[in-house]
């Protein structure tokens, strides 16, 4: 049988960091402390991939959205257009990631692969409230009264990290990738 140099690429998540109260960006080497099933299974699969000794690339991302499928951006476009008022969490911060930007980075990485765990999201930081405000502004849904609320007021079956900003230094230094600012990418997504 012929040996082949295959690369295993896994797209992972900020959920591997759990609900720890970080106030600095999470680095690729930082220990994961997931609390939910999704985060635990993602971290477990990362560990298994690394333990196999295969040639791997793990890309963690966060707050992923696009013009397709079900996601926060599309939901907020709909809700701000149809609801007179809306409460959105302001005490969880991160960086939205446009799926098209992630796709471009994956292609860049495939062209010059390097083994490792890397983080990718767009640039900047915002809360879910800030993200919603910007979505409504871009699409012109100005009639909805968007109010901020604590995450404790909005029960969720999923435990999200309170501060899920990803440290992207390693991917920048390894692949020389440019990271669009989250608002620029959001405008691009919505204009499509």
What are the functions of these language-model segments?
Residues 112-158:
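Mid/C-terminal beta-alpha module of Rossmann-like enzyme folds, strongest
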Residues 7, 22, 47, 100-101, ...:
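Catalytic phosphate/metal-binding cores of nucleic-acid and nucleotide-processing enzymes, i.e., regions
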Residues 47-94, 100-101, 107:
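NAD(P)-dependent short-chain dehydrogenase/reductase
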Residues 127-133, 150-189:
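Conserved C-terminal active-site "lid" loop/helix of NAD(P)H-dependent oxidoreductases
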Residues 7, 16-59, 64:
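Catalytic helix-loop patch of NAD(P)-dependent Rossmann-fold dehydrogenases
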């Amino acid at each position: 049988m012929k040996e082949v140099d295959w690369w295993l690429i896994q797209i992972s998540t900020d959920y591997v960091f759990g609900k720890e109260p970080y106030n600095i960006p999470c680095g690729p080497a930082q220990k994961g402390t997931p609390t939910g099933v999704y985060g635990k299974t993602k971290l477990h699969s990362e560990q298994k991939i690394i333990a196999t000794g295969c040639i791997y690339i793990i890309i963690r991302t966060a707050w992923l959205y696009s013009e397709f499928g079900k996601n926060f951006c599309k939901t907020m476009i709909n809700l701000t257009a149809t609801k007179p008022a809306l409460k959105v969490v302001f005490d969880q911060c991160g960086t939205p990631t446009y799926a098209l930007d992630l796709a471009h980075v994956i292609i860049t990485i495939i062209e010059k692969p390097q083994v490792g765990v890397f983080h990718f999201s767009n640039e900047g930081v915002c809360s879910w409230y800030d993200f919603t405000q910007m979505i409504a502004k871009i699409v012109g849904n100005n009639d909805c009264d968007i109010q901020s609320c604590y995450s404790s007021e909005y029960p969720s079956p999923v435990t999200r990290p309170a501060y899920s900003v990803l440290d992207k230094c390693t991917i920048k230094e390894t692949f020389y990738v440019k990271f669009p600012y989250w608002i620029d990418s959001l405008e691009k997504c919505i204009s499509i």
